[in-house]
C-alpha cells in the first residue's frame, strides 16, 4: 500500500506518516530560515544630496530610519567635495530613553581631509531615527550640496 513499508525480517507494516510529518516540519523551518537569510542582503543603497546654509546654522543632511522600526546601518558616507571650510562638524543624533541626544561629533577639514567621510563603517543598530547634521565655519559653504550614501538592513523580530 502507498505510505506503508515493511521492515526487513519483520512481518508488520510500518506507517510513513511520522516521517512525512517530520519532513513537513523541516520544510517549514527551512522556509523560515530562508526568509531570514534573504534579508541579509539588505536594502538597496540609499543615496542623495542635501543643499543647505551649512555655515549659518547646523543643518540636517539626512534622517535615517523610522520611529519603532529596527534597522542596522552598515555604512554611512558623506561627501564634502563641494565645501571649503576648515572645520566641518558632523553630528549624529538619536533618541536615548525618549529624548533626542547627540551621540557622535567629529570635525573635518575640507581643505586637507579626504572628501569622502566614512561616518559609520561597520554595523550600528538603531530602533528609531538617526539624524545626521553638518555645520561649516565658512560662509562660502552656504548653498552647497553635501552628498550622502548609506546601507540599511531591516532587523526582523
Identify the function of each model-found stretch:
Residues 59-96, 133-136, 151:
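Beta-rich globular "head" domains
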Residues 71-76, 122-146:
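Noncatalytic modules at the cell exterior or secretory-pathway interfaces
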Residues 1-44:
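Fibrous stalk/shaft segments of extracellular and virion attachment machinery
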Residues 87-120:
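Terminal beta-strand-rich extracellular "head" domains
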Residues 11-13, 51-54, 58-61, 100-105:
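Tryptophan-centered short beta-strand motifs
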Residues 63-64, 79, 106, 119-122:
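Beta-strand-rich interaction surfaces with strong enrichment in secreted/lumenal proteins
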Residues 49, 136-157:
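C-terminal interaction-tip segments
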Residues 44-69, 82-87, 115-116, 140-142:
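Surface-exposed ligand/attachment interfaces on beta-rich extracellular proteins
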Amino acid at each position: 500500500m502507498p505510505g506503508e513499508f515493511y521492515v526487513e525480517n519483520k512481518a508488520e507494516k510500518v506507517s510513513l506518516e511520522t516521517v512525512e510529518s517530520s519532513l513537513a516540519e523541516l520544510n517549514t523551518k527551512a522556509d523560515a530560515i530562508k526568509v531570514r537569510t534573504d534579508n541579509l542582503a539588505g536594502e538597496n543603497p540609499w543615496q542623495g544630496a542635501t543643499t543647505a546654509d551649512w555655515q549659518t546654522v547646523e543643518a540636517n543632511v539626512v534622517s535615517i530610519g523610522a520611529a519603532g522600526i529596527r534597522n542596522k546601518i552598515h555604512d554611512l558616507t558623506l561627501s564634502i567635495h563641494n565645501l571649503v571650510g576648515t572645520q566641518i562638524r558632523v553630528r549624529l543624533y538619536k533618541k536615548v530613553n525618549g529624548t533626542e541626544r547627540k551621540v557622535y561629533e567629529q570635525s573635518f577639514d575640507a581643505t586637507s581631509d579626504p572628501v569622502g567621510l566614512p561616518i559609520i563603517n561597520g554595523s550600528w543598530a538603531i530602533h528609531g531615527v538617526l539624524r545626521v547634521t553638518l555645520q561649516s565655519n565658512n560662509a562660502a559653504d552656504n548653498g552647497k550640496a553635501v552628498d550622502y550614501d548609506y546601507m540599511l538592513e531591516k532587523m526582523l523580530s
